[in-house]
Amino acid sequence: MKKISHIITVMIAALTLAACNNAKVPGDYSKSESLPAIYPDYAGTTIPVNIAPLCFMYTGDATDMVTQIAYQDTEILCSGIKAVPDTDEWKELLNKAKGNKLQVTVYTENNDVWTQHKPFAISVSPDSI
C-alpha cells in the first residue's frame, strides 16, 4: 500500500511540474477588476528572498488556470488549478527581484472563456530567514 501511495505521489508531482513547463498565457481573454480567489491569498504580502516556492490554488469556478509570476524580463508560468512554481526558476526569480516586487497575474478559464484577474504584487525582502 505504501508503494502505491508513493508511486501516485511521484506521478502527481511529475504532472504538476510538466504543467508548469508547458504553460502559455491565453491569447484571448477578458479583464476582471477583481483579485483572483486563491488560497492561500498572497496578495500584498512580503516574503524573504530565500523562501520556498509559494504554491496556491484557485478556489472559484474554473476548469483551468494559468499563473504568471514576473519581475522585469524574468517570469514563471504555471498551468492547472494549483500553481506550483519550479524551485530553480523560483530561486532565480527571487534573487533578481530582491528588494522589489513580483507581479502575479492569474488567468482562469470557465466555459471556454478566459479571464485575466487583477494582478497583485508580492514584495521580496532582501533579508533571508
Functional labels for PLM-detected ranges:
Residues 16-19:
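C-terminal motif of bacterial Sec signal peptides marking the signal peptidase cleavage site
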Residues 59-71:
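Solvent-exposed loop/turn segments flanking beta-strands in beta-repeat/beta-sandwich domains
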Residues 81-99:
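Signal that preferentially marks extracellular ectodomain short beta-strand elements
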Residues 96-110:
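Short, aromatic- and glycine-rich surface loops/edge beta-strands on solvent-exposed regions
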